[in-house]
Amino acid sequence: MSNCTFTLFIISLVQLGSSLLAQKDSTKILGEVHIKAIRSNSQMATSSSIIKTEELQHLNLGQDIPTLIQQLPALQLSTDAGNGIGYSYLYIRGMDAQRIQVNINGVPYNDAESQEVYWVNIPDLFSSADDIQVQRGIGFSAMGGTGLGGSISIKTTKRHLKPFLTYQTSFGSFNTYKNTLQASTGVLPDGWQITSRGSWIQSEGFVDRAWSRLGSFYLDVSKYGDRYTSHIIASHGRERTYQSWYGLSEEDYRAGDRQKNIAGTDYGSKAGEPFANQIDNYHQTHLQWIQNFLWKNGQQSSLTAYMTRGLGYYEDYKANQDFANYGNGLAGFGDLTRQLWLDNYLYGVNASHKIEKAQFSNTSAISFSYYMGDHFGRVNEFFTPPAGNALDRFYLNDAKKTDLTAFNKFVYQANKSSFVLDLQLRRVNYSSAGSLRNQSIFSFDKNFTFFNPKLGWSYTIDAKSKFYSFLGLSHREPVRSDFLDEDALSQPRPEKVYNLELGYEKKWTSSELKVNVFAMYFIDQLVPTGNINTVGAPIRQNVDKSYRAGAELEWNYCFSKKLSFYMNQYLAANRILDYKNYLIAYNESDYSVNVSASEQIYYTSTSIAFSPSWISYAELKYSPWSH
């Protein structure tokens, strides 16, 4: 591979762009130890991929990060609007975002309560990213939570040798537009650098009325010294999207009505045209201060403080409502519109210290985060005036969550072998109390303590091939909906997984092969039951024993400097063992449980929902202007 560089590529629209001044970025940055402390490298035994964002800039047309990286092994994508703009979701080995840990510059991005990753809240982050690492399986420790399906690490602290000003615009189907303006001073003689970006993205979407209006800005004020770097980063995203998360019925799908959107009709109960303001409206602000030090003895330290602020709502039309559910003393029935709000803050600090010698390195790290959020609802309009006085908030509950994580990662190099011992301890407290939309009162206060040990070994056979193995244990706590869903049969339990990985990598002059075999044995895995909650999200339930096992393969081949081929394959078995499903029957007269008519179904082995057994990807790339 000495004369050939493989670049991932998928078919895209043509991008129109203009660059007033451009330059090559530095690839060696002093003191980026906060990234080194949480990422895997060539010494570590993990199944991972790294994408330099400059390799995919020709595809950066406004779509979310899941769309841009979906070609990696074992990844799936779904998107509400149908074109990758707006709400998009990523799955790794069949596991959704609630099991994927996402960090931006070492700062956890997953929502603290739902563990979801809302890419729509950070539109065009890809334009500010330097690289993205995707790690499959539980992997080694990171700041904050631990992923079960995988982890994604995004680095935006980019050093520019020269100043530049760049404007990019693109347009395409469904009235899609993207405009991005970026500028940087480059590193000035005194070591200062200011980098900024502003973006605007809009699209009408493939699905009916699934329009998106997305805006964001990014600012990084940096100082590069002889033995330190400092970054103050401020970013903000705003999204306004028409709701399109209700899905498509099998009947409509078979009829060919793939663009149908029932949002704004209250599942067909509203007469006339769909409600025009059935929107999701959310703002999110991120502040990060990152300080890195390189001491004279070669040791490295980092300190990061951060704050994430979120505020917004989604609005919907509800038909034939009992007004008593919208405030004590209200009476009557009729249609209304309401807004369901989320107002939250996340504060945190990360610290790490790394000692590196000729044959070993040791990284010790600790992180702490504190989350507080309010959930409340407001009635916008009663189309039939109720009897009584409406409340300003017809439900209100708050939540608090603390997460304390500490880990120590020891790497020892002996001849051709490299050993990694990673020990992580997490302590989580999650509490919430108040009223729900149905006026019921609830409260819970849960504490979790997790010990997550991991062991890795890699063996370098020669300069172009290596073998690695990984064995680890990890846990992840239940999320908000697991505690609150009305159909939950019992209090949810944390998930626990044992993960084994075996891999082989080989390079030739014009090609490269990667093979990875994995086995993941779960205790109390939370899996979808097939039911949905009041907002259409899948209801999850613990299953005692289950597993995910399979193989991943990647192959690159370079025919010439201009023509290359890339493919990957994912094959897996995803099964639940000894599963009991309870079908509860109700009496029509009073909806009480009919015990005699209820039944229990026992499964010795059944598939896990949303978990494919085969994912395949292939591409042939021709670059006529390559040298």
Go through the PLM ranges and name each one.
Residues 31-62, 89:
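N-terminal periplasmic "start-of-domain" segments of outer-membrane beta-barrel proteins
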Residues 222, 229-288, 315-336:
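Acidic/polar loop-and-plug regions of large Gram-negative outer-membrane beta-barrel proteins
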Residues 66-108, 130:
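Extracytoplasmic beta-strand/coil segments of soluble accessory domains associated
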Residues 415, 519-521, 541-627:
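Gram-negative outer-membrane beta-barrel transporters
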Residues 180-218, 313-337, 343, 376-380, ...:
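Surface-exposed extracellular loop regions of Gram-negative outer-membrane beta-barrel proteins
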Residues 108-136, 155, 252:
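Short acidic/polar hinge/loop motifs at secondary-structure boundaries
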Residues 138-141, 150-187, 198-208, 399:
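Short strand-turn segments of transmembrane beta-barrel domains in outer membranes
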Residues 359-361, 367-369, 390, 394-522, ...:
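Structural signature of Gram-negative outer-membrane beta-barrels, strongest in the C-terminal barrel
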